[in-house]
UniProtKB/Swiss-Prot annotation:
Organism for this UniProt entry: Pectobacterium atrosepticum (strain SCRI 1043 / ATCC BAA-672)
Claim: ATP-binding is one of the keywords in the record: yes
Keyword line: ATP-binding, Carbohydrate metabolism, Kinase, Nucleotide-binding, Transferase
Binding-site positions, substrate: 17, 60, 90-93
Enzyme kind, highest EC tier: transferase
Presence of keyword Nuclease: no
Name of the gene: dtnK
Positions annotated to bind ATP: 254, 375-378, 421
A GO term, aspect molecular function: ATP binding
Name of the protein this chain belongs to: D-threonate kinase
Length: 442
């Protein structure tokens, strides 16, 4: 089989309820996609397509024939307004709803040879073993979902649930085989044999990533069937990012665990560049040369439309090495912190001035789309280096990131965001990136 890597294209998600629609859509949005959730297919038009459209058919508790009709109509409506790309049939990770009817309808409407069914959401404790759904270590039929008052589940077997509403040929690929390098070849083989529904075991999120990569290697786009975990995996594989006219410059001096997780989440986007600061280099005779190099790296990222994150903490062990570092340098903790903060302030000023000097004419300044300052000492050091005399608060992002404008600083009315190092969750920096992108587009 030739190695055919599918291009990005758009994404359609067909969900059977509103909360499930949002669960699937948020994973795409967090990776830079422009996502709309649509309640009525009759209101769908080309302007809503963006990168991804999620259509809620509200059919989980409907009759199977109604669920089938609504699912087919959703796919047809998307195609009619010009939608092209990947189609995900979002299902409940505990198999509630009209599983067989909706998958069969989506497969027929999409007019593709096969559906890949990966129902798991490992990060939520839902996995697939030997074709059965397990929730937090318990077989599905031994959990509360089996007695759901509206849509009870009578079997943990995905194949059995499908067979209740469709007679399409089914095959299972268990975990050992899922993790093989030739998974795409195996999928093609089953499709060639006439299998229409392929159930794949999944134990961790990386398994879903491997499944998506195998799907992308096929010469056709299969229908993807799964829960939020699968849409997250597809979002990771897609490149939804676009060049940002005025990207964010983030300076993160916090060594907190959550700050590092926030950076890790942001780095999943292909339009984010990381500039690492080696603390040892700050105290070397060549520190000015090092700063010039870091300034150049940041400038290159920003002028290429990439958000740039500057950080001083490279791994979780650094916080435990501070005392040893202080002894080596003959400094107190306070002196070390002040030196680092001052350096980051000067580096930020150098980057801002270098970027501004690239302006095509003297009447329109060229500045970052925003500044994000994480860590209290870092925030005040940068503000001081930029000449600020105060801060005008305008609002808050993600419940923990005040934003506003530095008063009398060289960055003028550039939005500035500050965050205490340990605040927020893993998606906080992603929320900041989206805020800046929306702010710049206004």
């Amino acid at each position: 089989m030739p190695n055919v890597q599918q291009s990005a294209g758009q994404v359609l998600v067909v969900a059977d309820d509103f909360t499930g629609a949002n669960d699937a859509g948020v994973g795409l949005a967090q990776h830079g996609a422009r996502v709309s959730v649509v309640f009525d297919v009759n209101t769908l038009h080309a302007d809503l397509l963006g990168d991804a459209v999620v259509i809620n058919t509200d059919s989980r508790a409907a009759r199977d024939d109604v669920a089938s009709q609504r699912t087919a109509a959703a796919v047809a409506a998307w195609q009619a307004v010009g939608g092209k790309g990947w189609i995900i049939k979002k299902i409940d990770s505990t198999l509630r709803g009209n599983l067989g009817a909706e998958v069969a309808a989506a497969l027929s409407a999409a007019d593709v040879p096969v559906a890949l069914i990966a129902a798991a959401s490992p990060t939520l404790g839902r996995v697939t073993r030997q074709g059965e759904v397990w929730v937090n270590g318990r077989r599905l039929t031994d959990t509360e979902f089996a007695s759901d008052p509206k849509t009870p589940v009578t079997s943990a077997s995905i194949a059995a649930r499908l067979a209740e509403q469709t007679a399409l040929p089914v095959a299972e690929i268990h975990l050992d085989e899922v993790r093989q390098a030739n998974l795409a070849h195996r999928l093609q083989q089953l499709a060639d044999e006439g299998t229409r529904l392929i159930i794949l075991d999944t134990d961790v999120q990386d398994d879903l990533t491997h499944i998506v990569n195998a799907a992308r290697a096929l010469p056709f786009r299969p229908l993807l069937v799964g829960s939020a975990g699968l849409s997250d995996a597809l979002a990771t594989a897609q490149d939804f990012t676009r060049k940002t006219e005025k990207p964010l410059l983030a300076v993160v001096g916090s060594m907190s665990d959550i700050a590092q997780k926030q950076i890790a989440a942001a780095r999943l986007r292909s339009d984010v560049t990381l500039v690492e600061i080696d603390i040892n280099a700050l105290f070397s005779p060549d520190s000015s040369t090092v700063m010039a190099s870091q300034c150049e790296d940041a400038l290159k990222a920003l002028t290429n439309g990439h958000h740039c994150i500057i950080r001083t903490c490279h791994n979780e062990n650094q916080r435990f090495e501070i005392d040893a570092r202080c002894r080596e340098l003959g400094l107190s903790r306070q002196q070390l912190g002040e030196t680092i903060s001052h350096y980051l302030g000067e580096l930020t000023r150098s980057i801002v001035q270098a970027l501004d000097s690239l302006a095509a004419d003297g009447t329109r300044r060229r500045l970052p789309g925003g500044l994000y300052l994480s860590g209290g000492d870092i925030a005040i050091a940068v503000a001081t280096a930029l000449g600020a005399t105060g801060f005008q608060i305008k609002g808050q992002i993600a419940s923990c990131v005040p934003w506003g404008y530095l008063l009398n600083s060289i960055v003028g009315m550039t939005p500035v965001m500050t965050k205490a190092g340990g605040f927020g969750n893993e998606t906080t920096l992603l929320d900041v990136l989206r805020f800046i992108e929306e702010k710049v587009s206004e």
